[in-house]
């Protein structure tokens, strides 16, 4: 919605397209390391439609910044990305994320059906993944990094399973780092008796967790994740998952990535994945 050449105007307070929409920045939370979060109020100037409709018509797919080929102008790639950069189980009529949960791109309809036939149940949650997931750590210390926040919803059926399942008999597998962060956020809120978490039913909350060694993780037992960018907060999360409560996960992750490079594994969104048991 905000082309590169209009970002300066957006930062100053207003931007838009004549006859289509006007937008006003009504609040912003800037980071000392650059960037920040903006709360924007939109006014649609067309007879019909809302912000999502306008974005679908004039916007371009928000691919990760490390995919550097021409995106808006290359219609062949654009059509391919719209199909590939989306999980088969996504709620396509509810586009709330700015990025795909890329670990889920490895699952096909056929694979999911095979898992069901083997008695492996699948449970949904909705992730409002933000562009902050691509923000590298720029602070001199891990603790100094301003962690981005992401909204999530856990349906009642999924919540029930997270609460009653016993890891030793039915391990909980998180598909991707954002799923893991949502599950861990829910687990910590529940353990702390967070009043924002209802006693029963679905859960809607915002995960602002920054998980790094030597923290512990109790929200999931197994995870599948892609190979990520250097200086990513996702690397901190994965190293914690590898060795909860210990610093050894840092060295272990380095060894895993060295092995991946030696075997020419593909990295990032369209790359390979690893299963952590």
Give the positions of each predicted feature.
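Surface-exposed, charge/polar-rich loops and edge strands
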Residues: 1-277
